[in-house]
Amino acid sequence: MKSTVEQAMLFEEKSIFENQAIEQGYSRVAGVDEAGRGPLAGPVVAGACILPRGKVFLGIDDSKKLTPKQRRYLYELLLEDPEVDCGVGVVSVERIDEINILEATKEAMVQAIASLQSTPDFLLVDGLFLPHKVPSLKIIKGDARSVSIAAASIIAKEYRDELMRKLHVEYPEYGFDKHKGYGTAAHLQALKHFGPCVYHRKSFSPVKESIQEGVCQ
């Protein structure tokens, strides 16, 4: 585990894009990221986050690099801090099937930005060019390079995981609480046995194939 000093230095290193935007005259820089582009089931969720200038949040990193315990702690820390502005966007399975996952992801991001309490004047977006009235910068692997995007990734991931746990209560046979809709061996086996439920993405290949094979509920 990194020391407090090392974590503070890492936070500063990953603030380079935010600092550059501020030097250019922007003041409300929002990081934007998504969770759930790849799963076979469940919505796609986006997070947006504006971190206060001059405040260090130790441990902020790409949500995929954090343990569930670390991620949950940081999620609650961000939501409970009155100086942090967080927003969430959720796009349903039906909408994903209607417009495709890429466009649905962009739609979720726009929703997340709109749900912020204050309007950002610059966006740092993980991996996507996002058509938006607010100027933006696409950052490849931004969740590992920008603290704002990393914070947004934590918000999106935790929020979506909570949604998938709720879906598990409705359809426990699929194990949504464990794999969160991703195409694990156990999920594919359940899909083969039970067929897809209403929360499966029918435009995604394994689900589409199970429907064509006639195992749809």
From Swiss-Prot:
GO terms for cellular component: cytoplasm; ribonuclease H2 complex. Manganese or magnesium. Binds 1 divalent metal ion per monomer in the absence of substrate. May bind a second metal ion after substrate binding. It catalyses: Endonucleolytic cleavage to 5'-phosphomonoester. It comes from the Bacteria. Its EC number is 3.1.26.4. Residues 27-216 form the RNase H type-2 domain. It holds the Pfam family RNase_HII. This is Ribonuclease HII. The lineage of its organism: Bacteria, Pseudomonadati, Chlamydiota, Chlamydiia, Chlamydiales.
